Amino acid sequence: MATPDIPDLGFDDLDDALGFDLDPLEDLETESQHRITTRKMRSDLKHETIDATKRQALAEVMPALPGPGECYHIVSNGDFDYWTWIPVMIGYMGRADEYYGSTWTMNRRNVVGMMEMIDRGLIVRAAVVTGLYFKRREPAVYATLFQGLRRRGMRFACLENHTKVTLLANHERGDYLVLEGSANYTANPRIEQNIILNSEAVYRFHQGWLDEVIEIGRDEEPQD
């Protein structure tokens, strides 16, 4: 959004500037804030449409969960991203009793989506591992993830991590999904490779090292 056109006030010296009545600028600030909020609303609606399109594209490729012992190798062309797997697979499962997610970095929209699924009971227990790059490059998004998981009693670790693994389990159904791929929890349209399988043995394999990583890599409250 363009910055409001504030005219040159033509101050001759600093005293004149310090003595200027700031009240007229308050209306400009209010107007600016209103425009920002309106723009954000448009952006949200656009992203919701895009997210729905991505979920539909993935559902066409994977119209059902892999059965126990089944494994699929998928190369995606950017029609959906790595995060799209989570809501689609949980939709098939009904809920995830456990969710483990390991990624190098993450965007804010997917962080918010994760918290919403936890709050709705679609994810019962969550454990997330990210890379230090995420903390350094996106501190505000990192803080949203860290604080959101902590408030909900979930687990989190940040360390030198570059793995991309997702685990989703529904014990009652006997589904233990493992997703391995090249992408992060972001929205970059790229050609990516994915492997998805339904195997409790492979699930427990990844769960073991992720639990260890979370124990040694637990992070502290981010500093301002």
Language model regions located:
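PLD/PLD-like phosphodiesterase catalytic module centered on the HKD motif
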Residues: 1-224
